[in-house]
Swiss-Prot record:
It comes from Rattus norvegicus. It comes from the Eukaryota. This is ATP synthase F(0) complex subunit e, mitochondrial. Subunit e, of the mitochondrial membrane ATP synthase complex (F(1)F(0) ATP synthase or Complex V) that produces ATP from ADP in the presence of a proton gradient across the membrane which is generated by electron transport complexes of the respiratory chain. ATP synthase complex consist of a soluble F(1) head domain - the catalytic core - and a membrane F(1) domain - the membrane proton channel. These two domains are linked by a central stalk rotating inside the F(1) region and a stationary peripheral stalk. It is found in: Mitochondrion; Mitochondrion inner membrane. Coiled coil: none annotated. GO terms for molecular function: protein-containing complex binding; proton-transporting ATP synthase activity, rotational mechanism. Keywords: Acetylation, ATP synthesis, CF(0), Hydrogen ion transport, Ion transport, Membrane, Mitochondrion, Mitochondrion inner membrane, Phosphoprotein, Transport. The keyword Acetylation applies. Belongs to the ATPase e subunit family. The lineage of its organism: Eukaryota, Metazoa, Chordata, Craniata, Vertebrata. GO terms for biological process: proton motive force-driven mitochondrial ATP synthesis. Pfam families: ATP-synt_E. Component of the ATP synthase complex composed at least of ATP5F1A/subunit alpha, ATP5F1B/subunit beta, ATP5MC1/subunit c (homooctomer), MT-ATP6/subunit a, MT-ATP8/subunit 8, ATP5ME/subunit e, ATP5MF/subunit f, ATP5MG/subunit g, ATP5MK/subunit k, ATP5MJ/subunit j, ATP5F1C/subunit gamma, ATP5F1D/subunit delta, ATP5F1E/subunit epsilon, ATP5PF/subunit F6, ATP5PB/subunit b, ATP5PD/subunit d, ATP5PO/subunit OSCP.
């Protein structure tokens, strides 16, 4: 096995600083995007309900025309 390489404390500090800053940025970005995604999912669900209701009504009207007494 290869022995570990000595790394400058300045480089270590830079790496860990970048890691921590990246984690902080990711957490902030996630907290910003999460409510938007929830709102989009809610709107999509409402739209799906509306479209399903329209399809149901359309299907009932088509069935009513087929069962008409004026055949």
């Amino acid at each position: 096995m290869v022995p570990p390489v000595q790394v400058s404390p300045l480089i270590k500090f830079g790496r860990y600083s970048a890691l921590i800053l990246g984690m902080a940025y990711g957490a902030k970005r996630y907290s910003y995007l999460k409510p938007r995604a929830e709102e989009e999912r809610r709107i999509a669900a409402e739209e799906k309900k509306r479209l399903d209701e329209l399809k149901r009504i359309e299907r009932e009207l088509a069935e009513a025309e087929d069962v008409s007494i004026f055949k």
